[in-house]
Amino acid sequence: MIKQQFHLRNYDWVVTFYYDVSAHDFYAVMNHLHIIGCKGENFVMAWNNINKGCCNRGLTYSDFGGKQSVVVVGEASTFGELMNSLSHEIHHLSVHIAQSNDLDLAGEEVCYIDGEVTQRVFEAFISGTSYNMLSTFDASSPLSLDSCTDHSCWKGCSRMNR
């Protein structure tokens, strides 16, 4: 699991991303969700989502009052699925921030939020590590831990690679 946290200054919003989350990471992620106020039905839904340990899953939970969000992107079966999960969860995050700030969901500013978050995510994958994680993948092939010589890259879905 990879954890990234950043602050969106224009909205005074703290975002924590968890990438490559598997059932093994379950308690750490659930604890963070609980800390920021995820309770009741939302907590049960998150519990079931993360605890399944399946590929190509994600979730976004936001504490509107505390101006903070937790975004979870699970293991991915392919590079395309990884990109799909990332863009899907980034969209949820952007909508939450927009709703909290009474922004027009069809307006340009929501797209700027998407763009800023995407840049931050990109930095985590490229600049934030000494190893270029994306260079090891063939976009048409399932991701595999075996394709990475130092095992620092995205391992993909363990069920798909065994």
Regions found by a protein language model. Give the residues of each.
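Non-catalytic terminal regions of proteins
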Residues: M1-K52
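Generic recognition of cysteine residues
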Residues: C38, C54-C55, C111, C148, ...
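Post-HExxH zinc-binding segment in Zn-dependent metallohydrolases
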Residues: D104-S135
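Long, well-structured alpha-helical subdomains associated
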Residues: A124-T149, W154-R162
